[in-house]
A protein has these predicted regions:
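Conserved catalytic-loop aspartate of Hanks-type protein kinases
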Residues: 216
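AlphaC helix of the protein kinase catalytic domain
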Residues: 125-135
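Conserved short submotifs of the Hanks-type protein kinase catalytic core
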Residues: 110-124
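Activation segment signature within eukaryotic-like protein kinase domains
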Residues: 142-143
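Catalytic-loop of the protein kinase fold
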Residues: 154-171
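Short beta-strand micro-motifs within the conserved protein kinase catalytic domain, predominantly
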Residues: 98-113
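ATP-binding glycine-rich loop module of kinase domains
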Residues: 32-81
């Protein structure tokens, strides 16, 4: 990751810091001098297909020809490109993280591609909630914003597939302006194995079913629960108790069994 950060080559933008990463890629803060004494900042997600160079060799070792493996990964890149173009067409929706540009580059060895997705730079929901008190009205606005984003996307046949707090962003809030909650990072969950440690995915997806509009709505509900429950998912200990890996595993089993969720710590009965 550090080598990629140092060698990041994206148009005239320079890396500032690494913001995070997951199995789908790494996100950086980048900056560019506009030539008039101002510096623009943005977020850049870099996704590699295949995710690791050895993935190519593994498939060849399993009996596929290099040409077949290249064609397989090329189809994934084409699907991602179509998804990005579809999201670009609706990125002016106020509840979607604005996508400003995307670039696809083939590797020099012909065995893969890097996909660069530049978006507006905003704090994620966990970072925002750590520094801003929030009440029931804020959570209602959060839910309304995420549902509005999904309505726009599902109408176009776009399923997110990986809704979690880190993929929700917060804009506005300056000079008493009301904040806007935005959904970002669309479509990447469909091109990697299901993350069985994702505690916001619907149980059927964790069990192998494809993502769907219904599973997106389930994940929104889990995000709202998390926000109302001191940023803890169902069935795990509440603060100040630390959450252990065993707690998460047991909580996941309870969700998969369909156990009734305990009420979150905050929020009215009506909510």
């Amino acid at each position: 990751m550090e080598e990629r950060f140092r060698n990041l080559d994206y148009q005239n933008w320079k890396p500032v810091r690494t913001l995070g990463g997951d199995s789908y890629g790494t996100v950086y803060e980048i900056a560019r001098d506009d030539g008039f004494g101002m510096v623009d900042h943005a977020a850049l997600k870099v996704l590699s297909i295949p995710a690791a160079p050895e993935d190519f060799d593994t498939l060849v070792a399993e009996g596929r020809t290099p040409e077949e493996v290249t064609a397989l990964f090329h189809r994934q890149v084409e699907t991602i490109a179509r998804q990005l173009m579809a999201v670009d067409a609706i990125s002016d929706d106020p509840n979607l993280l604005r996508c400003e540009d995307h670039v696809i580059r083939a590797h020099a060895d012909g065995r893969g591609w890097d996909i660069y997705v530049r978006t507006e730079l905003l704090p994620s929901l966990p970072d925002y909630l750590r520094n801003h008190p929030h009440g029931e009205a804020d959570i209602i606005r959060l839910g309304a914003g995420l549902c509005s984003a999904l309505e726009t996307c599902h109408r176009r046949g776009i399923v997110h597939g990986d809704i979690k707090p880190r993929n929700v962003f917060v804009g506005g809030g300056n000079f008493n302006e009301q904040v806007t909650y935005k959904l970002g990072d669309f479509g990447m969950a469909q091109f990697s194995a299901v993350d069985n440690t994702n505690d916001f995915m619907a149980p059927e997806v964790l069990c192998g079913a494809p993502v769907s509009p219904a599973s997106d709505l389930y994940s929104v509900g889990m995000v709202l629960y998390w926000a109302l429950n001191e940023r803890r998912i169902p069935f795990v200990p509440l603060p100040p108790t630390a959450v252990e890996a065993s707690d998460l595993a047991i909580a996941r089993e309870q969700r998969l069994r369909g156990d009734p969720l305990p009420e979150p710590l905050h929020g009215s009965q009506a909510l």
